[in-house]
């Protein structure tokens, strides 16, 4: 999987290329080091491969490297941008298998989110708020100013649309279409016009 993509951004000065990686990172703004940029790109691919293989959990804030009982942000899935960012490079970097854990999580979120949509909004289909976790929590949590953000599930679905867009497999679209439709129907049922902007 890792060897599917090679990236060549040019050659670095041999004296710079011979430096330890941490020194190259510290000096990156001083001059050109295209080989470090290529290495960094491949490092990002490695992180996704290592933390999101089929049959595992999706990549979260700290991934598989968390060693704390009480990690920053509880090592949850912050689904207002962080989780999405983990997966943005997957399709363009030939890592489509790495999306499987996220796809599975979305099916599980939709199941939990259907209960949440009914309980909180008295509306059909499904919703997920700002965060989720191993148990696929979909309720607003933590601070109200960011927790009451019901677009987490819908925003995550962009990755599944990208998967379809890259592969154009009709069977895949049939599989994930109920998720897309359910999220869209939730918003169709809950969006309201702002009377001050008519």
What are these model-derived regions, one by one?
Residues 33-36, 169, 198:
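Loop/turn elements at helix/coil->beta-strand transitions in domains of secreted/extracellular proteins
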Residues 1-77, 95-116:
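Acidic/polar, glycine-enriched structural segments that form the non-catalytic walls/loops
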Residues 72-193:
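Aromatic-rich carbohydrate-recognition surfaces in CAZymes
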Residues 55-64, 175, 192-198:
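Short, glycine/acidic-rich hinge or "gate" loops at secondary-structure transitions
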């Amino acid at each position: 999987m890792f060897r599917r993509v090679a990236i060549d951004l040019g050659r670095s000065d041999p004296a710079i290329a011979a430096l330890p990686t941490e020194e190259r990172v510290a000096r990156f703004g001083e001059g050109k080091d295209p080989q470090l940029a290529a290495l960094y790109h491949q490092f990002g691919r490695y992180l996704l491969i290592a933390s999101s293989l089929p049959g595992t959990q999706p990549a979260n804030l700290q991934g598989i490297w968390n060693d704390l009982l009480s990690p920053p942000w509880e090592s949850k899935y912050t689904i207002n941008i962080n989780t999405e960012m983990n997966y943005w490079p997957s399709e363009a970097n030939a890592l489509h298998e790495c999306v499987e854990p996220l796809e599975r999580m979305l099916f599980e979120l939709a199941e939990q989110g259907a209960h949440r949509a009914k309980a909180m909004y008295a509306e059909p289909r499904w919703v997920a708020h700002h965060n989720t976790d191993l148990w696929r929590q979909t309720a607003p949590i933590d601070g109200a100013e960011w927790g009451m953000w019901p677009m987490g599930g819908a925003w995550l679905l962009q990755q599944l649309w990208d998967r379809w867009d890259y592969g154009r497999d009709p069977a895949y679209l049939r599989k994930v279409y109920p998720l897309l439709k359910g999220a869209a129907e939730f918003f169709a049922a809950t969006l309201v016009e702002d009377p001050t902007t008519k």
